């Protein structure tokens, strides 16, 4: 319990220090997340479409500031971002909460299968992607899509018997790569 408490204190200090290091950037992201979450609440089932995320965000931000319940800091850091800086919110905004939950279930399920079968490298890749996606926008780049699909597929295929040749699994990866590209 002492180690857990010490770890929590160190983590809290580290997060606070990182926040102070780039305060305006952090405040801007918090505003973006706040406004994006409000936009998701307006259309949670189907989202607004991938191409209209920036427009939906702009409309939600306009409504937020029109209500007048904002701080001076929020007014100072407001802008017109192309991305929400949080892929979970971005996916929910684009395609709705059900698609987000389905994607999380698929990635989480493949992580569990991979972990159970000793695919720790792939599980680490999925975990790092998940952490990175919390404060950035990796799904905007095809290389990250491909990496995510390959890690999910690698974990999922870890349950296949070893009698299936490696070339067949490689062929599936190549097909997935072609579909993404």
Locations of regions flagged by a protein language model:
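Transmembrane helix irregularities
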Residues: 92-96, 134-135
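Interfacial juxtamembrane loops and adjacent helix segments
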Residues: 50-93
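Structural signature of transmembrane alpha-helix termini at the membrane-water interface
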Residues: 15-19, 105-115, 131-138, 154
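Transmembrane alpha-helices of multi-pass inner-membrane enzymes
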Residues: 1, 7, 118-172
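Membrane-interface helix-loop junctions at the exits of transmembrane helices
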Residues: 46, 55-68, 131-142
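Hydrophobic transmembrane alpha-helices and their immediate junctions
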Residues: 95-121
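A membrane-periplasm/extracellular boundary helix in multi-pass inner-membrane enzymes
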Residues: 1-42, 50, 59, 166-181
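Alpha-helical membrane-protein architecture signal
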Residues: 33, 46, 81-88, 127
């Amino acid at each position: 319990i002492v180690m857990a408490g010490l770890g929590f204190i160190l983590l809290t200090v580290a997060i606070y220090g990182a926040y102070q290091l780039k305060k305006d950037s952090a405040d801007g992201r918090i505003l973006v997340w706040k406004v994006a979450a409000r936009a998701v609440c307006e259309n949670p089932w189907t989202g607004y479409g991938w191409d209209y995320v920036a427009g939906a965000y702009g409309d939600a931000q306009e409504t937020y500031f029109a209500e007048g319940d904002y701080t001076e800091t929020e007014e100072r850091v407001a802008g017109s971002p192309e991305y929400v800086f949080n892929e979970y919110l971005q996916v929910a905004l684009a395609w709705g909460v059900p698609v987000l939950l389905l994607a999380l279930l698929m990635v989480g399920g493949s992580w569990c299968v991979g972990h159970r079968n000793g695919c720790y490298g792939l599980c680490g890749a999925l975990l790092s992607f998940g952490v990175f996606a919390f404060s950035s926008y990796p799904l905007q780049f095809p290389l990250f899509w491909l990496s995510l699909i390959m890690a999910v597929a690698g974990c999922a295929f870890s349950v296949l018997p070893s009698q299936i040749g490696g070339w067949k699994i490689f062929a599936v990866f190549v097909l997935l790569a072609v579909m993404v590209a």
